[in-house]
């Protein structure tokens, strides 16, 4: 799996950073899952390696405008492309009415269904939000001025590496049988032999895990959600120097984001959602924010628009 940052600014766009959005490209299918959709997201998609037609799920963290104002326009555009299977939209209470109002007020009728899932109960009761045979999604309540939620996407463990030479040495002909064996299934061969796929596979390979936390001040629930994750994307609106503002506005500093990664035993941290006050021309720059976080959690990286990062 990999992610593409479509917007990395906090609150308002800047000349170099759009407001929040991130696309997750699944490794086991052609699907793309979108996390947040600030104003201008569809323009960012057009400039990126993402195809909007592949978006099947959208996860919204909270109802502030810099995370949702791009949704109605994106959905309207997707309607023109004839997405007949529909889109699943996960998010807070009020998201459905916001989208419905925006679309109906502009006399927009979509050519595909929207399937809404309100996440509050899933977060408060620690229930799985979505699951199939390859992935599961969990969410957790964050600490912001309005209800906000973090999301975790976890791949299930994958079969071990298939030993082709062993199969060939046992005179098992290549073909669909190899696929079944790789899945660890018991297979009846044309010559009457029964073989167990587990004998041909190495140990299971650990699935990848990705966590997205914004907007929030430091939160123990974010630490729990991120436990042993391969990649944590965490908001870092303020520098440590502006910690008082972070507590006032319930956003995170660089140190809070790094502390979350450290306490959760996350392998890699990428900080995003930077305040536009930090530019290369100001006394505190984005590079300074990165250095602050790296003092606490060395494997920290700085998000920028259109950055593509592997989960592992």
From Swiss-Prot:
Its cofactor is Zn(2+). Signal peptide: none annotated. It is an enzyme of class 3 (hydrolase). InterPro entries: Metallo-B-lactamas, RibonucZ/Hydroxyglut_hydro, RNase_Z/BN. Zn(2+) 2 binds at residues 66-67, 215, 273. Zinc phosphodiesterase, which displays some tRNA 3'-processing endonuclease activity. Probably involved in tRNA maturation, by removing a 3'-trailer from precursor tRNA. This is Ribonuclease Z. The gene is rnz.
């Amino acid at each position: 799996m990999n992610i593409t940052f479509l917007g990395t600014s906090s609150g308002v766009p800047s000349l170099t950073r759009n407001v929040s959005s991130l696309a997750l490209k699944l490794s086991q299918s052609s699907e793309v899952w979108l996390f947040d959709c600030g104003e201008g997201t569809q323009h960012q998609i057009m400039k990126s390696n993402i195809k909007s037609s592949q978006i099947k799920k959208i996860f919204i963290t909270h109802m502030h405008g810099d995370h949702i104002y791009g949704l109605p326009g994106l959905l309207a555009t997707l309607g023109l492309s004839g997405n007949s299977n529909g889109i699943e939209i996960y998010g807070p209470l009020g998201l459905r009415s916001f989208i419905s109002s925006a679309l109906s007020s502009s006399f927009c009728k979509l050519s595909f269904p929207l399937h809404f899932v309100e996440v509050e109960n899933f977060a408060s009761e620690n229930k799985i939000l979505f699951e199939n045979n390859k992935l599961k999604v969990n969410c957790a309540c964050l600490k912001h001025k309005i209800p906000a939620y973090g999301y975790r996407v976890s791949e299930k463990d994958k079969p071990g590496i298939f030993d082709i030479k062993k199969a060939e040495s046992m005179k098992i002909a290549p073909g669909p049988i190899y696929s079944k064996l790789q899945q660890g299934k018991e297979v009846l061969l044309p010559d009457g032999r029964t073989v167990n796929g587990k004998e041909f596979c190495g140990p299971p390979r650990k699935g990848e895990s990705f966590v997205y936390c914004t907007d929030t001040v430091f939160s123990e629930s974010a630490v729990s959600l991120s436990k042993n994750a391969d990649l944590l994307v965490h908001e870092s609106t303020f520098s440590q120097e502006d910690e008082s503002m972070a507590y006032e506005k319930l956003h995170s500093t660089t140190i809070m984001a790094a502390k979350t990664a450290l306490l959760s035993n996350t392998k890699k941290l990428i900080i995003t959602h930077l305040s536009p006050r930090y530019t290369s021309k100001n006394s505190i720059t984005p590079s300074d924010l990165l250095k602050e976080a790296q003092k606490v959690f060395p494997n920290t990286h700085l998000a920028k628009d259109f950055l593509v990062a592997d989960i592992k």
